[in-house]
Amino acid sequence: MAAAGKGSPRTSVVPVVGLADDDVEQWRRALDSFLVHGKTADTIRKLSRLFKGDGHYGLLASLVIMQSAFGHSSKFRHKLSVMEVIQFSDKTAVTLYRKLKDHKHETGIEQVFWDCKQRLALLLENECGCVDCQRLASVLQRDRGVMRPPNLNPHQKHSQAATFLTWIYNQAVLNLNVAVLEDQIEVLFIKPDEFFDFAPDMRDELSLLTSCLHFCWLHFILKHYVHLELDVIQEHIANTCEKLGVPPVNSLGQVQTLLGSLSSSLLRRKSHLHEVPHNTVHYDPLSEVHSHMSRKYTLTPQTLAKISSLVPRKLSQFQKEHIARRLRLGRRPHPPPPSHPPPRPPPLQRQLSVSGEVGPVCDLLSDLSLLGAAGGAEDPSGSPEKEEFHLEISDSESEDEEDGDGDGDGQEDEASKGEEDEEEFKLEISDSDEEGEEDGDGDDEAGGDGGCGCGEGGTEEGEDEDDQGIEFRDSDSDGEGGEGASDEGDDGGDGNEERDPGSDSEEEEVRLEISDSDDEEEGGLAQQVKFMGREGAAGGRDPGEGDASGDEGHEGAVGGYDPKGEDPFYDLKEFEELLQGDRPDRGRRKKSKSKKSKVLDRSGYYRESV
């Protein structure tokens, strides 16, 4: 052991027996080339030529130094980063195999790979037997783990899993850097849907078999990639130790011990003292790899969920029997069915009020059906409850009839009250007409020639009331509105003239005739036209002027469409001549129209201010 200068780390010396001073530079270049390029076999051949054969102590020391230097290189550190993927692939393959075989104990990855490839080859030959399946079966039988993975779905030309594994295989064989991502690993899980052209009962098993084989190949390829240099060095170390007749060595410390046991005469020969860091004397890179491989690894919940999502879990026969046994123990015996039916509840009885109000017919029918069913079930011949119920209904009906007879006068009173209400409604409408007429008088006084416009306004109110009062047969309001309009147009007065009692009786007769049924529709129309003529003659009301809506209504009834398909009472032309009789306000209407036309001609549009 030699110590370096002050402040430098402690070093250790390893003698390289048989290395001349002239060959030291060539020896160092060979080791540096190995650390840079990684050409293990080429470097070992160069070292063998320097020592004139394999059975030499200097070659043994050189191989151990070479292995120790590789353990501290960046290349080896990168390969150690792949160890996690190796453990992941190993654990995933074993888990898939357990799911496939449905057992608890774990099996080695070699046994898993051999069993899965044999089972897959058997399924392809027996179930399909096509040319592609036969070729794949023969490839699987020759496969030893470290080879280019084939496409495990022979009926498809391309497979993402086979493409990814082929890339990993090429990188490992060329001893290049390998980087595996989680997203790339997901393509190794094959779903049952991808085997759609196989039998449905085979798809689940094919999915588990192919997924398991994919992870087995990933494990074997990456493991070979990590052990590539170390396995070659260890092989030559073992061969050299065998030729020298010494036990195999794996570290620099073991080499120092071995060379220290040799005779001093052998050590005095040509030798080179190689200095190494003291912390690397007992370092074995192969033991570090084994320590990484022996670490306990647990799959993440995401990976377990991915495995479970491939094929739903099926219960084994033992689990089915265990569950059935527990169900039998937890099941309680049900009570025996009763020998006789349970007693029926008493029938429902409806209590009807004596006020004369009877419920809906549907309620009575439903109650009768329920009571009839209940009574029929107890006594087919007839039950007293059913008779009693009919008696109650008959009593209530008789009471209702008596109430109806007793209230006959009341109904007449109600009818008279209804007529009084109609008269009050008519009076209210006439009052509103008088208010409209009074407003019209005020407009006449303020505007001079505004009498025609107010008269027209009064008739428009009469039109609205006429349209609304058709349902109430309100013809008085129309007559009063027309009279007010005509009186205001002629004299400018208030329009509150007395009505002829004869015309009132005629109006009532016409209203009664109009309110008859549809069978007397033609007669009602005739009487209505006759009433319109008399009203215009008596009150001075012009239907064509005062009630435009009324004209449209009568025109539709007389000269328009006849629902019964009969000829109208008057022709349209005769009816128009009848409506366009001698009207005292015809000239004023023309005058007002002429004013509007002048304003329209002068300005081009009508202005409300004018």
Curated annotation (Swiss-Prot):
Pro residues: compositionally biased ranges: 335-348
Composition-biased stretches (Basic residues): 586-597
Highest rank taxon of the organism: Viruses
Biased composition (Gly residues): 448-457
UniProt biased composition (Basic and acidic residues): 384-393, 563-585, 598-610
Composition bias type Acidic residues, residue spans: 394-447, 458-469, 477-495, 503-523
Pfam families linked: DUF832 (PF05734)
InterPro entries, per the entry: Herpesvirus_BRRF2-like
Stretches the record annotates as Disordered: 327-353, 373-610
Similarity comment: family membership: Belongs to the herpesviridae BBRF2 family.
Protein name: Tegument protein G48
Annotated source species: Equine herpesvirus 2 (strain 86/87)
